[in-house]
Structures are given as C-alpha cells and as structure tokens.
C-alpha cells in the first residue's frame, strides 16, 4: 500500500473519528455518473487531520487536507474565453471516476480515481464542474517538488485519456512492519491480551518457548507494536502524509 493508504488504515480505526464520520451529514446532491458532488461538513477527530470521508470503511472516498497531505495538488481554475485555443479541462471527459467536494469555505476538492489509485486536487477559482483552464505554481519548496511533479504527471495522463500510472504510486517501504503493527492494533482494539496477540502474530510454538524469557524480547515486541499502532491511530498517521 502507499503511504496515504496506510494513513487511512490507521485513522479509520480511531473511535472518535468513526463517531465523527457517522455523525457527519450525508451527500445532498449528485450528478450523472461518473461525477458526484458533495456538500458536507468535515469529519475530524481530536488528534486527527482535517479529513472528509464517505465512511470509515477501507474503500471509502477520502479527501485529505491540503495543509497536511503533500500528495494533494493545488490548482487554480479559470474560465476560458470563447476565443481561447486552449483545450478545456472537463471532469466528465476524464477516463476515471470524479468526486467533487464543496467545502464550507467555498473550496473545491476533486478526487480522481480508477480501480487502484487516486489523485486529489485542491481547486480555487472558477467552478470546476464547467470547462476551465487549470493552472498551478511552477516553483515549489524542495520537500514538495517530487510529490507535485508526480501529481502533475498523473493529471496530464488523465487529460490525454490514460490511466493513473502505477509507477507514480510507490508502496510504503515500511509496509511489512506497518502490517504487523496494524494487526496488533486490531487485536488490541478487539480486547485480545498481549499473549493472544503474540500467538496470532508470531505463532504459538514460538510463544510457548519464549514468552517467559526473562529478557522479555517477545513481550516487548508486542507491547511496542500495540503502542505504535495506537500512536498512529491517534494522530501519528499524519507522518505518512508528509
């Protein structure tokens, strides 16, 4: 999974976030497929990022805050004069699903997605539901450069009828470790003891042999995994967005 996908896996397990998502208003207006428009309040949690989410399910539509997530591409939408020779940008012409979120501050957030990947735009200016010209800054801080260039390449690919390139969505290198931590968190949230977690994650034979070792290596490993999982669930996932 990508870093954003791992961030979502931890955030969506946060009980406060789940309550906020459940309490948030539902979509109130829809357009014809493949474009859907929402107008709703944000779902947040006490230790979390400003985030809009359809639900807290694994495959939910999720909008991350541009203030936190480096993968969101900010663009300016401008009306095209009738005499313009510029090819207009039209959501309904793209070879992907498009969801537009209308935020309370009048901001427009666009999520472009195919079966595997997503691209999020933070749009200011003209109404993105009409044919427009999109502009963005050409110079970015060094820490944003790689992410912005990837997002631009994704946007260009969609604009010429291609899919979102898989090579622009690298997997998180810490995936195996995060998977271990996530499974430990799930077990802990379900009420499992540390020994039960160890048996599920490492195997009963190893646990029977090493659980009472005075050096506590196995116990410490489980304790660290649970602690790390809860930290990621309660706000630490933000590090995966930057």
Go through each PLM region and give its residues.
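DNA-contacting interfaces and partner/effector-binding or oligomerization modules
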Residues: 1-133
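Short, charged/polar micro-motifs that form catalytic or ligand-binding hotspots
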Residues: 3-11, 167-174, 183-187, 212-219
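Intrinsic-disorder-associated interaction segments
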Residues: 10, 141-148, 215, 222
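Amphipathic alpha-helical interface segments used for dimerization/assembly
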Residues: 11, 21, 185-188, 201, ...
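Surface-exposed polar/charged interaction patches
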Residues: 27, 158-161, 232
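Mixed-charge (acidic/basic) macromolecular-recognition segments
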Residues: 134-208
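Accessory, usually C-terminal, subdomains that scaffold auxiliary metal cofactors
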Residues: 174, 178, 202-242
